[in-house]
A protein has these predicted regions:
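Positively charged
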Residues: 2-187
Length: 187
């Protein structure tokens, strides 16, 4: 972890669930492996990350998004069931040849989206909170979310995948300009 005390990059305590926001360069850090057994501070960080994910209506949060450059993220693509998963020191070991391209948003880049091509199936090696190793295959939305969070661990953001001139962010900005222009000229 970046800090020895339970305060993150943002300087707040683990009670505050602020997120590191783009363009903060901390989001570009490559995360370090988590040591086992987990200490109490790391366990509290997992709880903090999970709460931040739900508080900000997300489906995944990487530790770097809450100010810690460690290889860990939480995910809950079925959050209505309230079953968050924790992935520590994850590695993608296999992915499908088949991909799908779609827009992705990010809690650390509010209002911005990037068009990202992702594998529809991945196999992941990771450890859980007890240090037990797992290998599991994920599909569709879970696979996309994991790839997104894995990018965070490598210092990448979904907006880095921007293709061409069109993006929803650019489109929305142009729409706002057009709307603002019409409103002013109609008065």
């Amino acid at each position: 972890m970046r800090n020895k005390v339970p305060t993150g990059r943002l300087g707040g305590t683990l009670v505050s669930r602020e997120l590191v926001k783009y363009p903060d360069v901390f989001l570009r850090k490559v995360s370090k492996d988590v040591a086992f057994p987990l200490d109490d501070k790391t366990k509290r960080l997992i709880t903090w990350m999970t709460r931040a994910m739900y508080q900000h209506n997300g489906i995944g949060v990487a530790a770097v998004q809450v100010g810690y450059d460690v290889r860990m993220f939480t995910m809950d693509c079925t959050r209505y069931q309230g079953k968050p998963q924790v992935f520590i020191n994850p590695t993608i070991v296999k992915n499908s040849e088949e991909t799908i391209t779609d827009f992705e948003g990010c809690l650390s880049a509010p209002g911005k989206q990037g068009e990202v091509k992702r594998h529809i199936r991945i196999t992941l090696n990771y450890k859980d909170e007890e240090g037990e190793e797992h290998q599991k295959t994920f599909y569709n939305m879970e696979a996309r979310c994991i790839q997104h969070e894995m990018d965070h661990l490598e210092g990448k953001l979904c907006i880095d995948y921007e293709k061409g001139e069109y993006s929803r962010d650019k489109h929305n900005a142009q729409t706002m300009v057009d709307t603002d222009f019409r409103t002013k000229s109609d008065s």
